[in-house]
């Protein structure tokens, strides 16, 4: 599988060989560790939607040295020398997870809710999770989508051509004709249009396939790339990515290319699903887990609750904290309505404490203020915070529901905390549904 380090969120990476056997840390050799630190420091701290401090933090521990902590983003970082660091989400499964195969399967299911590829592509990739690392799974999904396009037939278009022909067609290019054919008056240097597959979209795909051919360490992926390249024999490799991406045509005829063009940008231009764009030669393919978790839970809630007559909407932006100036929009993750009843659910990709311990289970004060604002502005007492279940909570087994209640003369706010089991999401949300309908 090549040179890689596979870690989970909240793992701590070090380069001190004396602690290489310590289970509290993930050990990385000095050269790769310094390249990783360089990558982190090259990312602008003022990135619009993603602060590097939410992803990787560099700390110093006495005796241990520099420590890199990982959180909130999942995916792949490829360092300049080809070494890969693959970050997987910390998902509680309740049992051993050899090679993180089940974690990868759950993560792919979650990722499918973002519609970056058709669901079938994620399902097929999931079958290979036990023998492919995360990067190879992403490559495999891209190849599946190319295969789907090839089966339907790659599109041709009228392409501008120039050539010195023995017959006349199109438009004579006078200057070039005089240069080339002063002693060959039987020939014509002309410009003409030809219906041909050598269009921008196909050139981009061919360039991506050739790049992935060099990068992949998977025998399965390498074989698939060879097969697919035969379908692009009449297509040139893109040599000017910017020009070809600008030349993409978006219409009904090219709908099958849309996802492939997005992912080709990821592989060719290092255009990420985050705003991270470091100045080093390192490349990254990263997904914000807060967004992935929110999208997945919202998708699954619609499946579970809609048949029971609930109207479920996500990221609803209809209320403001200050109505007169329409400022500070309130956007709860999920709003459910039925027969005049309103329930607000907000997802939080955070690891709560298993016990209260005087710290409110680790729930932030800012989150509670936010829930209180939702309650007042939406005129409902029913507020739910949805956290992923973790090992500490799982160990406690059956427990009293966690809730916080605030009452005054005219209204009541009840914030309920629920732990979602991502490995058994349907079963977990059915239990939540039963609690909502008690």
What are these model-predicted stretches?
Residues 1-47, 277-438:
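Catalytic core segments in nucleotide and nucleic-acid processing enzymes
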Residues 2-277, 283:
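Residue(s) in the substrate-gating loop at a strand-loop-helix junction
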